[in-house]
Amino acid sequence: MDLGLALGAGGARNISFGHNMTTLNYTLSRGIGKALFPGDEILITQLDHEANRGPWLSLREEGVVVREVALLPDGTLDYDDLRTKINENTRLVAMGFSSNALGTVNEVGLVRELTHKVGAWLLVDAVHYAPHFPIDVNALGVDFLLCSAYKFYGTHIGVLYSRDGLLDRIPVYTLRTQEQHAPYCIETGTLNHAAIAGVKAAVEYISTFGTGETLRARIVSGMERIGEYEHILGREIYRGLKGIKGVEVVGPDFGKGKRVPTVSFTMEGMDPIDVCTLLDRRGICAWDGHFYAVRPIEVLGLLEKGGVTRVGVSLYNTADEVQRLLEAVTDIAEGKLRKE
């Protein structure tokens, strides 16, 4: 299976499909929850999308202790807080690879070391990371990784990677007629076979941007090439917005390590939804609010203010489009583009 190659997995046996990432994660959490006892602990973060918070928070009803790793004001996780909260009772750490709201890329390698040191599992939500960087699940050493194919030019279908033999040990809910082993045991009902075929096409499309003797090599180099291009455009947006009076960029600087090309900002005296409406007049697509990452927007004190305005780039965007965006935001800030 091409997707197994794309993620660096051992093969098709490690890849399960679902209607979306949220559904897969909820199904997985129900199974893991059946194997836990009152007093067992799960760690989540204040930076995550609700799809990687809600399924685990609901296990509190079963007596599972769910703790949050704190979010710092600069949009990064407090890893000292994580070190304080992870302990011998921790059974699972669920975290995002990158933030769809702030653009932050988390230190998965560090968290893996801390997680496996106490014998816990590490689950990573890579939905917002997968479109921008190559992934090697074996090198990462994660136990579970989830993503969504529509984010990397594919169809709307959820994907779950599980480490060899791990899914077979989890009592997920299955039908009598269902295959009782990985990868099928978590795949409920008839899958969208057309969407699965679309995933294969998306992976092959990405590989056309790369070079190498094998498909895996072409996928990796293709994603690296895409990521480098996107980084240049994203950095230009970040720096350009920082230079506009009345604009406050939310999230880590592009000069502080790896970052996805997603940039969120607020404008003095304006609601984010109004900023999006004005940008739309210039043919620019932006989104406002929390993007289902409610908790980080709430922690940063922005939820009651309508959240943030979010823009981002992909491989099909251009430097000219970035300049159009910056010119439009400048006009909004200077009152040249305003509500009628």
Task: Give the positions of each predicted feature.
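Pyridoxal 5′-phosphate
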Residues: 1-340
